[in-house]
Curated annotation (Swiss-Prot):
It comes from the Bacteria. Keywords: Nodulation, Phosphopantetheine, Phosphoprotein, Plasmid. This is Nodulation protein F. Transmembrane segments: none annotated. It comes from Rhizobium leguminosarum bv. viciae.
Length: 92
């Protein structure tokens, strides 16, 4: 069972994907999990920047540019969740 943070991030990414791509993804929006590859949702580097911006706003975190470069290695939803979790832990 996914925790609250995971569900919130999946929901945020789901909304972004739906707004950007409509229903034109290879994964049904209701089937997004932590294993879902970002590319299967049509999220490229620009889309990832949008995701990061939305997550900054949602959680009040700041993603430094040098950190954002490291985030280019994010491959799936679970990677995004763990990266955000790490930043939230630092904020406390």
């Amino acid at each position: 069972m996914a925790d609250q943070l995971t569900l919130e991030i999946i929901s945020a990414i789901n909304k972004l994907v739906k707004a950007e791509n409509g229903e034109r993804t290879s994964v049904a929006l209701g089937e997004i999990t932590t294993d879902t590859e970002l590319t299967s949702l049509g999220i490229d580097s620009l889309g990832l920047a949008d995701v990061l911006w939305d997550l900054e706003q949602l959680y009040g975190i700041k993603i430094e540019m040098n950190t954002a470069d490291a985030w280019s290695n994010l491959n799936n939803i679970g990677d995004v969740v763990e990266a955000v979790r790490g930043l939230l832990t630092k904020e406390v």
